[in-house]
A protein has these predicted regions:
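Conserved N-terminal segment of class I S-adenosyl-L-methionine
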Residues: 2-95
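Flexible loop residues that form catalytic
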Residues: 65, 101, 129
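Short, surface-exposed linear patches
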Residues: 67-69, 82-87, 100, 118-120, ...
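A short beta-strand submotif of the Rossmann-like class I SAM-dependent methyltransferase core
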Residues: 79, 95-101, 110
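S-adenosyl-L-methionine-dependent methyltransferase catalytic module, highlighting the catalytic core
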Residues: 107-162
């Protein structure tokens, strides 16, 4: 195998390991959110449609910007913007699980979404791509890097496109 082939194989293995790690994290966090919702006799709101059903389960309600039946075959689909979630769920408190959603928002949009969620959530669990993944960097739809600060708050770092 020539040098280019070795480099390509290394990149594929590197990204594959990260994707498996993220898959495991999504499953674990989703299962925890589901258990918290069940324990509290609350609805689970999944934000970010589980595309093709591979990454995590559905919620009692599932919110996505676009309802595409090829991707999102779930009970109670809701098409809408995460920043308006407090207007959609005024009548109840929910446990929130969002998967690979927050990075699609600018820092100001992300803060707006978290503020809306804080009005309806009993508990919230969020996952997003790791900053070390290649797919996280090359996605043209990612607008920020969410992370957790020392106080446990979610913060957003603007993406630079250089």
């Amino acid at each position: 195998m020539d040098m280019l082939g070795l480099i390509l194989a290394g990149v594929i293995v590197y990204e594959g390991c990260w994707q498996l790690s993220e898959h495991r994290e999504r499953k674990q966090v989703y299962n925890h959110a589901r258990a918290v919702a069940d324990f509290n006799n609350a609805s689970l709101l999944v934000i970010g449609c589980p595309k093709w059903g591979l990454w995590h389960g559905h919620g009692d309600y599932t919110l996505d910007l676009i309802h595409d039946p090829r991707w999102c075959v779930c009970p109670n689909p809701i098409t809408g913007d995460i920043r308006d979630v407090d207007k959609m769920f005024m009548w109840k408190s929910v446990v929130v699980f969002s998967s690979h959603v927050l990075e699609h928002l600018t820092p100001s949009e992300g803060q707006e979404a978290l503020n809306a969620l804080s009005k309806i959530e009993l508990a919230a669990y969020h996952v997003w791509p790791n900053k070390k993944t290649i797919s996280g960097w090359v996605s043209p739809w990612h607008k920020s890097w969410p992370s957790v600060d020392n106080d446990g708050d979610i913060i957003f770092e603007a993406r630079s496109r250089q």
